[in-house]
């Protein structure tokens, strides 16, 4: 099968498309023929080990010291169950699915074997594979952190980085939970964030959200503290009494299959929609990583595989 292989950490150019053996599912696995995947910011951080020194050591211990132990990166997919092991009962051959393979990687390829208890769900019938692949990463992370902050109807939520993969999901999911949402983004993305349901949008190139009169029950950093420490340094100044600040890189999120199912149901009903900035072919994976590395993508960057 064709796959993107990463044999050392470094810039996008370390990625190569190669022919490698097609995996066979073990007893408790399913093999999925992948139609689409996505390049997430996490993929790029891991490929380049662009992390703080402490996190870099932890990442090397977890995924490989000099190179990823699993040379095929990629965390999300949409595709079709191609083969099942004898003990895998959750999905049938031919079933269309989408999912998030966070710790095992392997989705930059034509096929991947997926554990029976992995984060996999039936694909929304009204969405394309490209749209479905754009849901799991931002959707699951945003849902985890909004729940962690106990966002409820009537809460006022500020989403910093509202136009990225996590941010676009956070705006929509916070609105679904009944919150009043303020999004922070650049001029070019004001229209997008407004269309996703934000009540107010702050253009950070024009004004500082800290200078506004509003106070919030939650300030959600959907970018990550390493990248947004400067703009968010004064974020506690805008908190309402009892309010909280959370960041997408605050600890290890608890990602659950039932939440992926929920995201699929919300997308099927049109209550949330995946946002796709650009779509690349698998052969253009280096260019896709270069684009994500720039840090200005709107929503998701999707890769077509099949």
Q: Model-flagged regions — what are they?
A:
Residues 98, 219-220:
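N-terminal Rossmann-like NAD(P) cofactor-binding module of classical short-chain dehydrogenase/reductase
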Residues 85-87, 181-192, 209, 226-227:
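Short glycine/proline-centered loop/turn elements that form peptide/ligand docking sites
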Residues 103-116:
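A structural motif shared across PLP-dependent enzymes of the aminotransferase-like
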Residues 211-219:
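A short acidic, Gly/Pro-enriched loop at the edge of an enzyme's catalytic core
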Residues 271-275, 289-306:
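C-terminal capping/lid region of NAD(P)-dependent oxidoreductase domains
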Residues 221-275, 282, 305-306:
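Glycine-rich phosphate-binding loop and adjacent beta-alpha segment
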Residues 21-38, 52-103:
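Glycine-rich beta-strand-centered segment in the early N-terminal region that forms part
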Residues 93, 132-203:
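Mid-domain Rossmann-like dinucleotide-binding core that forms the NAD(H)/NADP(H) cofactor-binding site
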